[in-house]
Amino acid sequence: MLGCGVQVKSKANKSIGAFDMNALRWSKIILCTDADVDGFHIRTMLLTMLYRLTPDLIENNKVFIAESPLYEITSKDRTYFAYNEREKDQFLGELAGQKYTIQRSKGLGENDPDMMNLTTMNPKTRRLIQVKPGDIQQAAQMFDVLLGDNLTGRKDYIAQHGSEYLDDLDVS
């Protein structure tokens, strides 16, 4: 799919091409998922797959995340796109006393094509987050804890650190 092969060393991979950055079909790999918790889970799985199969793409700054709006807020003369709760609250504060409508995005597949063209798909206006290699060992360890085979380790991590992520929960 990407054209560059994979970096997995295994006898079972004989039919899969060896990794070659020069064969990459695109200058950027852009992950686009829903802006809710389910979308974040899918994004994490895609990043894990890329990290495990093609870590050089991350190390060479080829992987990006496209943010999609979570809310569309329309007032009399303007439309605002909020990408998180903080931005939504900020826009609503600016519109205090005015009439507006607010629509929560149900997912990329249900967004209006015009809205997607104005936001997520438009190279001039979209928000891209570059996935940076950072501390690759720390990232590898976190991927293994959250998505690896060690169920006890994952439960222990969640029990010890779960409270640190309470503000990020989507309970709507």
Model-derived regions, located:
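Conserved phosphate-chemistry cores used by DNA topoisomerases
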Residues: M1-S172
